Amino acid sequence: MEIKIVRNVLEANNKLAAEIRQRTANSKTLLVNLMSSPGSGKTTLLEKLIPMLQAKGYQIGVIEGDITTTMDAERLQPLNIPIVQINTEPFGGDCHLGAELVLPALDSLDLANLDFVFIENVGNLVCPAEFDTGADVNVVVLSVTEGGDKPLKYPLMFRVCHLALISKTDLLPYLDLNLDLLRQNMLQINPKLTIFPISAQRGDGLADLRDWLIKLKR
Amino acid sequence: MEIKIVRNVLEANNKLAAEIRQRTANSKTLLVNLMSSPGSGKTTLLEKLIPMLQAKGYQIGVIEGDITTTMDAERLQPLNIPIVQINTEPFGGDCHLGAELVLPALDSLDLANLDFVFIENVGNLVCPAEFDTGADVNVVVLSVTEGGDKPLKYPLMFRVCHLALISKTDLLPYLDLNLDLLRQNMLQINPKLTIFPISAQRGDGLADLRDWLIKLKR
């Protein structure tokens, strides 16, 4: 009985995710879902990456997912782009964004005039991986401070993602991290994963990331 | 109807948590539940703290919670202490430890001869806060690399904890973190929170932590 309930939730979610994909296909918008542990640098990445896409003439929107507060959305306000905040607290403090929350958020965006919409998911390396948001691209951000074993310990996240960003590489000189082993562990879980090391603060790797996203643009 | 189901799960969990508290009260064991995002340094903390408690004559046990792998338990094996691994993957890749998993783990430990049992919960700053494990003390570990806004964005975790450890303080010189603001944000969510900054790698703050735990010992 319990399994049936979970299945129904996932089936309902997948149906809404398909509806989202239909909508973004119609408007030729690339929907990119950023997932990670809390504090891996998703918001800082958006602060730096979005102006680089704007400089190439693209129009950007953001869906901010947080349990509570609008702190991340406020950090992005200087970019002068449409931002929709989803707070999951009224829905029981949900630990992830489901398609049922992303779909109404899309209603608030003028998709026909947006080339890229970034979803910043709730900071959590576990649950967001279980729910399809309808995104075209799933991206996991893992900070170098989190340790090289994380892909093996949280495999589903790395299995559902197309791209892994190894963030905060500016801190590498002060850490014991074996970057090659981290890459190997990521590829052991998902051999198709594209991997970019980045430092949003220094700008390292962001041009590669920008060009990779532009190539996927319909 | 859905709310009813969630309530039943939480009620069943709370009943088992009470049973756990009865057992550890009988054996005079202090059960300590460590929670945090992935990669905040829970395992490294246990590697350093446990020998310091052993040096004071205390007997220690550990319950390791992971979705999959026994990597953390293996890191603790040199300590030569009883360790019980709980992998939540067979239970649907659960993102937290519930009392229903901790209770059978206690069966594998000789509680009468253990002064402290540490639970290393699944790395997740959201869901573990929602489920009482039956622990006497809830501890959140937040790494300085995660940013000062996290208590405001993940308030439930800081609300249910007695102690907050600000970890990896050895990295502070390379970060933009305002440590006073982080403390203020923690106390804004939970004014009763005890806070220790620590560096497990350098040993900073660990003697304070050890003495704080010993004072709570029955």
What are these regions (language model features)?
Chain A
Residues 36:
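The Walker A (P-loop) glycine that initiates the GxxxxGKT/S ATP-binding motif of P-loop NTPases
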Residues 43:
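Walker A/P-loop
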Residues 3-22, 26-32, 40, 49-135, ...:
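Nucleotide-state-sensitive switch-loop elements of NTP-binding domains
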Residues 59-60, 137, 162, 194:
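Residues at the starts of beta-strands that form the adenosine-phosphate
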Residues 119-182:
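Phosphate/Mg2+-binding loops and adjacent switch elements
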Residues 171-218:
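Canonical P-loop GTPase G-domain recognition
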Residues 66, 167, 199:
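Active-site glycine-centered loops adjacent to acidic/histidine catalytic or metal-binding residues
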